Amino acid sequence: MRVIVSFKRALAVWGVLALGLTVLAPAWAQQGTAPFRIGVLPNVSARLILTSYQPMREYFERELKRGVEIATAQDFRAFAENTRRGDYQLIVTAANLGRVAQADSNWQPLAIYDPKIPAILVARADNPNASVAQLRGKSLALANPQSLVALAGLQWLGSQGLQNGTDFKTVTAANDDSLGAVLGTGEAPLAIMSMGEFRAKTEAMRSTLRVVTEIAKLPGFLVMANPALPAAEQQRLKTLILAFPQTEEGKKFFALSGFANIRDVGEPELKPLDAFNDATRKGLGG
């Protein structure tokens, strides 16, 4: 199901949007020009995406002089499929998903978000055990199993002598209720998520959790252009996204989202992501 709403109405219907959505800017459709679609990875709730990306929508709408949509999907798999199908003109996606989109569908990397993303190991606040050995025979909770954070976390656990599928299994806990349930019952004594995902949780939920350790700092989100766009338009989009941090809209975006910068990115920085390509494709069902 696709839902299109104005920004003014969005906060009232965010629960509907979370099902797999498109969020539309004000009344540009009457002008007869198809909206420019920016796809944003659903690593947090639709409501948070809509709110934090409003300044970016306004910026591109002004610069492109056309309607702009901020769109997301129900989950990582759906977002990756939408990307492969070319549903968006521009995407903001996890670095590993972006690298696979580049390799398999020729999406073009334009920029990368800073700072790097901390991958963290989390437990209930009343669980004093800091050893990963407590996972043996139990489950590890993952917010987004296809994310670079999850893949890097599983790799790190392997280096600690714990193999997924042998020593423990994984369970998806994409929302506060499911995370609270699996951690609270002891089914999953530990969870892996990004610091951004942790901070996006309600204060009440965060108060029941503690960060056990930081596993790694990983590359930030990639901004990528649809390969079907003409080269000149791709270059224009790159110029616009690299100029965005210096604008008033950019400053508002960083204040809302917690990101600090959007900068140029090149092959030397992207090449190490190839180590996660096969695991990413497997996680996406490819």
What residue ranges belong to the model's regions?
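Bacterial N-terminal signal peptides
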Residues: 12-23
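Extracytoplasmic small-molecule ligand-binding "clamshell" domains
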Residues: 30-96
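Periplasmic-binding protein-like
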Residues: 34-43, 49, 115-123, 148, 152, 204-257, ...
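Ligand-binding cleft/hinge of the Venus flytrap
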Residues: 55-64, 111, 150-172, 199-206
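Short helix-initiation/N-cap motifs at beta->coil->alpha
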Residues: 70-81, 94, 165-181, 217-219
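A ligand-binding cleft/hinge motif common to bilobed small-molecule-binding domains
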Residues: 92-104, 159, 182-209
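Flexible hinge/capping segments at coil-to-helix
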Residues: 123-140
